[in-house]
């Protein structure tokens, strides 16, 4: 599956890149946003990603746009320290496209997808001491149930947690297919088009990568390094992420905050029906944007 950037036109419209501008793509991935920004104006892009496998996409862009893009392999929660330590200032815009990428899902060895057999990993950076195997084989039943419920919205979380614990008593759960089969054995699809393992895999991935904590830290750090009139744009894919962005943006726009921001759009921006037809992944995407006033 080719990774198609979601809400690309809408992101560019909000960002409005200009010649001489300096922009940060905090979630480089396959480079879709970075490429679009570089194409739209004679500007510079600093790209950030915790997954070192993205360097192949960066190399392609660096050849096409020499001296205009630089990649850092780092978590975006460290974005302020990263840019400060490299003396990068005058940031005109920062974009986030959060969540797992198609290339991560498509690689069975990364262990993100129940559609491809592979080791239980799900780590976005491959350096984490915690992975999906740790989650299913080491955590207490109550912790497993609460995480699957809170991060996956799975109402059968306790049933799933009990099944996982019973299965690991017999042998270590090693692969994505093994885990998916355990979940499916106690949660039945019925008429739903959604695979019973979907919410459980989402919850484990969020736990492994501390995605919600990273997101909150990342956008707060990004807000501190924007120049006056700089824009901060975040695209999310599920309600937990969007709630964090909405809350942080609301706090930043409150009168009396250290740096004053304003919402670029009062209502959240969603994908058009045309985009959803081409890229079904866009259905759940939401874009929020703010601008620093002072």
UniProtKB/Swiss-Prot annotation:
Catalytic activity of the protein: cytidine(1402) in 16S rRNA + S-adenosyl-L-methionine = N(4)-methylcytidine(1402) in 16S rRNA + S-adenosyl-L-homocysteine + H(+)
Stored InterPro entries: RsmH, SAM-dep_MeTrfase_MraW_recog, SAM-dependent_MTases_sf
Subcellular location per the Swiss-Prot or TrEMBL entry: Cytoplasm
Main location: cytoplasm
CC terms in the record's Gene Ontology section: cytoplasm
GO molecular function: rRNA (cytosine-N4-)-methyltransferase activity
Sites where the protein binds S-adenosyl-L-methionine: 31-33, 49, 76, 97, 104
Pfam families per UniProt: Methyltransf_5 (PF01795)
Listed Gene3D superfamilies: Putative methyltransferase TM0872, insert domain (1.10.150.170), Vaccinia Virus protein VP39 (3.40.50.150)
The keyword Transferase is assigned to this record: yes
GO BP, one annotated term: rRNA base methylation
Assigned keywords, A-Z: Cytoplasm, Methyltransferase, rRNA processing, S-adenosyl-L-methionine, Transferase
EC id: 2.1.1.199
Similarity field: Belongs to the methyltransferase superfamily. RsmH family.
Functional description taken from the UniProt entry: Specifically methylates the N4 position of cytidine in position 1402 (C1402) of 16S rRNA.
Protein name listed in UniProt: Ribosomal RNA small subunit methyltransferase H
Organism: Wolbachia pipientis subsp. Culex pipiens (strain wPip)
């Amino acid at each position: 599956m080719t990774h198609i950037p979601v809400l690309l036109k809408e992101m560019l419209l909000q960002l409005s890149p200009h010649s001489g501008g300096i922009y940060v793509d905090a979630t480089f991935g396959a480079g879709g946003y970075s490429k679009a920004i570089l194409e739209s104006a004679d500007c510079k892009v600093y790209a950030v990603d915790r997954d070192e496998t993205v360097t192949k996409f960066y190399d392609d862009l660096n050849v096409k746009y020499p001296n205009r893009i630089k990649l850092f392999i780092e978590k975006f929660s460290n974005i302020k320290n990263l840019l400060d330590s490299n003396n990068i200032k005058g940031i005109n815009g920062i974009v986030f496209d959060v969540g797992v990428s198609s290339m991560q899902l498509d690689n069975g060895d990364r262990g993100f997808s129940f559609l491809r057999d592979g080791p239980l990993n799900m780590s976005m950076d491959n350096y984490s001491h915690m992975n999906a195997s740790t989650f299913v084989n080491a955590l207490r039943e109550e912790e497993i149930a609460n995480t699957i419920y809170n991060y996956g919205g799975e109402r059968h979380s306790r049933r799933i947690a009990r099944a996982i614990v019973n299965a690991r008593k017999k042998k270590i759960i090693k692969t994505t297919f093994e885990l998916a089969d355990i979940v499916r054995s106690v949660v039945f699809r019925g008429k739903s088009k959604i695979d019973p393992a979907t919410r459980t895999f989402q919850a484990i991935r969020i736990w492994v990568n501390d995605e919600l904590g990273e997101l909150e830290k990342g956008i707060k750090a990004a807000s501190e390094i924007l120049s006056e009139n700089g824009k901060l744009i975040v695209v999310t894919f599920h309600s937990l992420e969007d709630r964090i962005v909405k809350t942080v943006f609301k706090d930043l726009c409150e009168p009396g905050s250290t740096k004053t921001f304003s919402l670029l759009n009062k209502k959240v921006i969603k994908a058009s029906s045309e985009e959803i037809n081409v890229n079904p992944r866009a259905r759940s995407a939401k874009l929020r944007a703010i601008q620093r006033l002072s």
